[in-house]
């Protein structure tokens, strides 16, 4: 199967059997779209479905504001701010060489010029995001996305709001459409009574959606299984080794050895562990996000975003999920209660009728972040091994589109134009 990162042979032969390592949104979406193209799939995950950064995610489907994580605002925090446990962007002191490489690369890309270039590369895949969720719905996934009738970004002052308005201008300049309304605090409260009198200015984003990732991702897994896919999870499914045999791919798990025609590595913040041997040199760092749910007097009609505090609120059932924080730390680290309290403290002044002391479902998940803010999607140096990860905060939003495009590449042997900027070996 002569495919390389540099190009494709006319003799390309599509695989019949593919192993997908990772049962999060990206891995399961890739498996689903491979099945659509007639490929037999086996998914393995040592922890379980949605066990990485999927389950407690805010669940926003917001291609309109899906932007590169490295941005000039990160530099404004300064070293003192990012070392504070209460900062929304937290970097614990570390001497790890790989972590220092990540910080250096991330800082280098946190400029306006880099942001504009990366934003332009995200626009084509962003445009496919919502329509790809519709394909999954039409294909039988029983949990659906929700149209956000109100999606409000709330601020204390109009001056604070200027940052997002300027970002929207840059998003438009990159070629991405997003409709929005500029609101006063009173106008925002008329739309969403959850907002307190602290809110003096707001922006309503139009055309966005949300979902409950803890329900959606397992439903996607159920559909993959119903179509004949094999899913194994637990300690026996931990992948210990992957090797290109020259004829296929040998996948060694704690439970045994199996041969496939190709393999997809969709292991989130752990991507580098398996992908590095196949020429994926980009550092993938865990950017850990925290969330919890609280009772509210009235569940909002749509998400509420507090950009200055970097807090995301999503209605899920009869409770409100509150999420935030970007903590650059080992993905294996335990939940730090200080992060949870910092999010609650930041959100409390802006939310009316939300009991932020009655927290449940406290969670931490590791988002896979890259230094340039772009995902790693496509073939590696092995013609039979593919990578799919590094989406940062946007794995839920872009996961299905990633799976759709990567499945096309795996089956057809051609790199879709939307994926050209995201080569894992760049």
Regions found by a protein language model. Give the residues of each.
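Active-site substrate-recognition segment that forms the wall
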Residues: 57-60, 65, 69-109, 239-241, ...
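Extreme N-terminal leader/targeting segments of oxidoreductases
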Residues: 1-18, 36-37
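A conserved short coil-to-beta-strand element within the FAD-binding core of flavoproteins
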Residues: 183-187, 191, 232-249
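Rossmann-like flavin
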Residues: 100-219
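C-terminal catalytic lobe of FAD-dependent flavoproteins
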Residues: 308, 351-426
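Glycine-rich FAD pyrophosphate-binding loop
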Residues: 36-55
